Amino acid sequence: MLQLLSKTDFYSLRDSEKPFLIDNSDINNKTVGDFVHDIAAVYPHFFARKESSFLIFSEDIYEFMVIFFTALLAKKKVCLLNTGKYAYIKDIFNDDSLFVSGTAESQLNISQLLCSNPDTARTDAIDCSILRGLTISSSADIRFYTSGSTGNPKSIEKKLSHLEREVEELRACFYEEIENSLFLSSVFHYHVYGFLFYVL
């Protein structure tokens, strides 16, 4: 989606057949419409949670993006972890946090939420009207955690608007050279630089 995330009307994209994520197996290819329907399926679960801070980790890029976008739409503070290991998470976890992942330690398992109706046609399974009028705030809080040189979680706090400006700068510098290009990245989506290229 080559637009600012904070300007995206997800509801209007519910029927889009444009490619969103292309998997090399051709089995798990996702359209923008698939993505919006999965957000609509997960949104009620996130919105109903009392915790204001969601600790997020998933090695699966698609699950990661569903968690991330849905948490922001539900007005949650998003903390992006670079590992799902409990020994790491326990140092940053508190009573107002929820660990969301596809791992066994997760308090809310995203894989189960997405697989609850695998055989139902997309348009029949989910009513996307729950997303009508919802947008992601440009002032949304996003916190990255990196181990740095100490091995202990170190917090890097950003507003969504800061990240969007970084993406706009990258686009302004390189867009003509990279338009219609295929990117291969060695940096995972749960690290700040990989996040900028994969997610935003």
Question: Which residues does each PLM region occupy?
Answer:
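Conserved ATP-dependent adenylate/AMP-binding module captured primarily in the ANL superfamily
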Residues: 43-47, 68, 78-106, 162-184
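Active-site regions of enzymes building and remodeling cell-envelope glycoconjugates
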Residues: 96-98, 105-126
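Short beta-strand->loop structural element characteristic of the AMP-binding/adenylate-forming
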Residues: 20, 32, 54-59, 64-68, ...
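Conserved pre-ATP/AMP-binding loop-to-beta segment of ANL
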Residues: 2-5, 11-16, 122-145, 176-183
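Conserved AMP-binding loop of ANL adenylate-forming enzymes
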Residues: 56, 174-200
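Conserved AMP-binding/adenylate-forming core of the ANL superfamily
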Residues: 15-48, 158-161
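Conserved S/T- and glycine-rich ATP-binding loop of Class I adenylate-forming
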Residues: 54, 71, 146-149, 183, ...
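Conserved AMP-binding A3 loop
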Residues: 31, 133, 141-168
